[in-house]
Design a protein with these regions (language model features):
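Short, Gly/Pro- and small/polar-rich lid/capping loops
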Residues: 2-8
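Flexible loop/turn segments at secondary-structure boundaries
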Residues: 30-31, 38-39, 146, 153-156, ...
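Catalytic and substrate-binding clefts that recognize carbohydrates or anionic sugar/phosphate headgroups
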Residues: 60-211, 221-222, 234-239
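Aromatic-lined carbohydrate-binding/catalytic grooves of carbohydrate-active enzymes
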Residues: 208-333
Length: 333
């Protein structure tokens, strides 16, 4: 797994004008472009480790091009140009690889109809085949895949950076130094999918196994339950000898985040609705200690945090110390 060292070995880095290439493995190259020459060495939401053993590679400038060649890939970059171009026959940047004896050429923006796909953020309103919702994944029958750290996800979210806390606290979310920069990882593993996934964990971190209980029986229903309702449900399930592992407490556990009311009219909220759950700590303790149940609170954070929340002042004070643009009326981003 990754060792959380976001700084690549200098021997793996090749700079050319506004471009920076990092040869991470024989099959993986990081590609950056920054008009401001502000390249990122901080960890991101996706990549936490770039300090890998430097693979064998050569670099050469010839006839106006930079060539980087590993045991598996040949990268060609037209010196002094923006890497994304409309000339598919002679792109400014291309990578060539062998896929089962067939030469495959990639360039920025090339579409991949053979990608084996990844995930989707939500299954809300899912009925039947939802493959068109899926984002591109790490594996493809075409033999290559790209992790584009600058491309917004389908829900509009971005991969941001982590600013290291030098005082022993928690690293904090930060914008990129150059918000217009390009930053992508080319993975040319052919059909060696196992190696592709293995090398991905070297840069992204080890994938933890879920605890066994999450594969058990969950009780979850979108209904305006009270604490007593949920105690009654647990007791009835137990009385029927139905094994249960997780109890989901749906969104009415919290107050209306904007107004502080307990009417259940607001999806976003962070403070317990004492009209329905008069003793939250006691209830959670009863679930954990007496019923041996795990629990989770259904949360919809999209609208942010408003001053009616119980701990708003403390949260605001902490964030205001980190960011100068925090507004006192709400924390919505």
């Amino acid at each position: 797994g990754a060792q959380d060292n976001s700084m690549a070995d200098e021997k793996a880095i090749v700079k050319s004008g506004n471009m920076r290439f990092t040869v991470l493995t024989p099959e993986m190259i990081r590609i950056e472009y920054s008009a401001k020459l502000q390249f990122e060495d901080r960890a991101s939401f996706v990549v936490i480790n770039r300090h890998l053993p430097v693979p064998n590679f050569t670099q050469e400038e010839r006839d106006g091009y930079l060539y980087l060649t590993t045991d598996k890939l040949e990268l060609r970059y037209k010196l002094g140009t923006y890497p994304v171009s409309n000339d598919r026959c002679n792109p400014n940047l291309q990578i060539t690889l062998d896929v089962n004896g067939v030469e495959e050429v990639w360039y920025p923006g090339k579409q991949d109809p053979y990608n084996l796909k990844g995930t989707t953020r939500t299954l809300d309103r899912a009925e039947g085949d939802v493959r068109e919702w899926l984002e591109n994944g790490l594996l493809s029958r075409v033999g290559w895949a790209v992790i584009d750290e600058r491309e917004p996800r389908k829900d509009g979210s971005l991969s941001l950076m982590f600013e290291r806390d030098t005082n022993g606290g928690m690293d904090w979310v930060a914008q990129r130094k150059d918000t217009a920069a390009l930053d992508m990882y080319f993975m040319g593993y052919g059909h060696d999918y196992k190696k592709a996934l293995g090398d991905f964990t070297k840069i992204a971190g080890k994938i933890p196994l879920p605890p066994l209980y999450v594969f058990g029986y969950w009780y979850s229903k979108f209904q305006r339950y009270t604490e007593q309702d949920m105690r009654d449900i647990v007791n009835e399930i137990r009385s029927r000898d139905i094994p249960m592992d997780v109890l989901v407490i749906d969104m009415d556990w919290h107050r209306n985040g904007k107004t502080g009311s307990t009417d259940g009219t607001e999806w976003t909220g962070w403070s317990w609705n004492k009209a329905l759950f008069p003793d939250p700590a006691g209830f959670i303790s009863w679930l954990h200690d007496e019923q041996n149940l795990n629990t989770t609170l259904n949360l919809h954070p999209a609208d942010g945090v408003f001053p009616k929340e119980d701990n708003y002042d403390a949260l605001y004070a902490d964030l205001a110390g980190r960011y100068s643009d925090i507004k006192a009326d709400s924390l919505t981003n």
